[in-house]
A protein has these predicted regions:
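Hydrophobic alpha-helical segments
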Residues: 50, 86, 98-102, 217, ...
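Short secondary-structure boundary/capping segments
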Residues: 12-13, 203-206, 213, 256, ...
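12-transmembrane solute porter fold
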Residues: 19-44, 55, 61-65, 130, ...
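Structural signal for the C-terminal ends of transmembrane alpha-helices
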Residues: 130, 134-138, 193-197, 226, ...
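Conserved aromatic/hydrophobic "specificity hotspots" at molecular recognition or selectivity sites
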Residues: 174-213, 261, 271
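Membrane-interface helix caps and helix-loop-helix hairpins in membrane proteins
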Residues: 109, 173, 198-204, 229-235
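Transmembrane-helix bundle of Major Facilitator Superfamily
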Residues: 2-194, 328, 336, 340-371, ...
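Interfacial helix-loop-helix linkers and transmembrane-helix boundary segments
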Residues: 80-87, 143-146, 201-207, 263-271
Length: 466
């Protein structure tokens, strides 16, 4: 047996003594990546006013990050398998932190957009590599608890970003939504360089550059098509062209993976029921969460006349409930099983979406979103534990990349679907019946999606005996 094999076997049998502090550091890094989405969204109006950015440029401040993040995550996961997760975590953190500094210093659109794309690339390296470390450091019930904490920080971070974005833009200014990442990133860099175990490389071979380019192009085309569909309609000519281009690129990627001796990923992973179930749940949960956060924050600011800061304060219970539900789900998952927990969580989510339809006003909106968020927080744990619960060490990085990619797919689908469903409410004037009907329609669509997903999850997620 080789030294590498011995180390790998030992790591699998003996829990790493610093695994919980490492989880805390990696979770904080993931929180920073998730916060960067909603914090920036809240600060967009202030950026536009100060830098004289038009609507297209502001859209790309968000889209550029999402495109780079989503399209490169499979590559990030595979590089973690090939070159070592620690090396890729630190490289991603360095790139993200440096890009955050550049974004805060930006005095116009070119530097800001370049920095945002670079942030997304750094996040795409960091996120799947960090998740693969969590999967390899923990096993059994401990893995469920660890994934619960990971999901709590990710899910709660999206809601906390609304509050943090309001506080920063009302205080030191929009640039600090980026500058705040610099000291946090540097502290994490020093701490992780010292504490993150240098796990044996999970896979050998060379990096499949053509495969990485094909899947990145396909994913970027699909995410951009979804973004455009939300703004310009699902039958927009360019959106349809992008959807077709994405399908063609994915087909070419699949064909190349079957031919090349060192593929980027084993396509048989996508034939495993737990992986398929996990990516289905993560996509649905993310789509619903992004959708409800978009709807809730827009309703509170444009329909109830709350400012950005007050909207952030109102979202604080949503963040706390999400984090508590995810942490709790990680503790009970082994006892009740993923299938039962997913169905219950989706039923709770659907019930929460109905509250703003049946009652109107700020209290009803916050209550409904909080109830829905409790179900969604649990779903993130179910998704991660189902997809990653039994992966081999050499597949941890690429499988984490797949899960993370479908997280971004879900976010893009959620934003596009909600934007379309609520178009009447968003276009209408504040306080009119048309606006209220538009929001009701969007929440009814979300309710239907959650209910349908519960039925699919009951069939798709393996039972505990399988």
């Amino acid at each position: 047996m080789s030294d590498t094999e011995t180390a790998g076997t030992h790591a699998a049998q003996t829990p790493h003594p610093r695994r919980w502090p490492v989880l805390g550091l990696l979770g904080l890094a993931q929180l920073m990546l998730i916060l960067d989405i909603t914090v920036v969204a809240i600060a967009l109006p202030h950026m536009g006013a100060e830098l004289d950015l038009d609507r297209a440029a502001l859209t790309w401040v968000v889209s550029g990050y999402a495109l780079a993040f989503g399209s490169l995550m499979l590559l990030g996961g595979r590089t973690a398998d090939l070159f070592g997760a620690k090396r890729i975590v630190l490289a991603g953190l360095v790139l993200f932190t440096a890009a955050s500094l550049a974004a805060g210093l930006a005095n116009g659109a070119p530097l800001l957009l370049t920095a945002r794309i670079s942030q997304g690339a750094g996040a795409a390296l960091l996120s799947p590599a960090a998740l693969s470390v969590v999967v390899r450091l923990f096993d059994g019930e401990e893995r469920n608890k660890a994934l619960g904490i990971w999901s709590a920080l990710g899910g709660g971070g999206a809601a906390l970003g609304v509050l943090l974005g309001g506080l920063i833009t009302a205080g030191p200014g929009w640039a600090w939504v980026f500058f705040i990442n610099v000291p946090v990133g540097l502290i994490l860099l020093v701490a992780l360089a010292r504490m993150l175990p240098d796990l044996p490389r999970a896979a050998t071979g060379s990096l499949d550059v053509p495969g990485a380019a094909l899947v990145a192009a396909a994913t970027a085309a699909l995410i951009y098509a979804l973004i455009r569909a939300g703004d310009h309609g699902w039958l927009n000519t360019l959106s349809l062209v992008l959807f077709a281009a994405a399908a063609a690129a994915y087909a070419a990627f699949a064909a190349w993976q079957r031919r090349t001796p060192a593929p980027l990923m084993d396509l048989r992973l996508l034939g495993r029921r737990p992986v398929v179930a996990g990516i289905f749940v993560i996509a649905v949960a993310t789509a619903l969460m992004v959708g409800v956060f978009f709807l809730g924050s827009f309703y509170l600011q444009n329909h109830q006349d709350h400012g950005a800061l007050m909207t952030g304060v109102l979202f604080l219970p949503v963040a706390l409930v999400t984090m508590a539900a995810a942490t709790g789900a990680g503790r009970v998952l082994g006892r009740h099983g993923a299938r039962v927990l997913a169905v219950v969580a989706l039923a709770v989510t659907a019930a929460g979406f109905l509250v703003p339809v049946l009652w109107s006003g700020t209290t009803a909106m916050v209550t409904g979103v909080s109830i829905a968020a409790s179900g969604l927080g649990a779903l993130f744990v179910v998704a991660s534990a189902t997809a990653l619960g039994h992966v081999a060490p050499h597949e941890a990085g690429v499988t984490s990349g797949i899960v993370s990619t479908f997280h971004e797919f879900g976010a893009s689908v959620g934003a596009a679907a909600v934007s379309s469903a609520a178009a009447a409410g968003i276009a209408a004037h504040t306080g009119t019946a048309t606006a209220a009907a538009g929001f009701d329609d969007a929440f009814l669509v979300a309710t239907g999606i959650a209910a349908a997903a519960a039925v699919i999850a009951l069939w798709l997620i393996p039972s505990r005996s399988e």
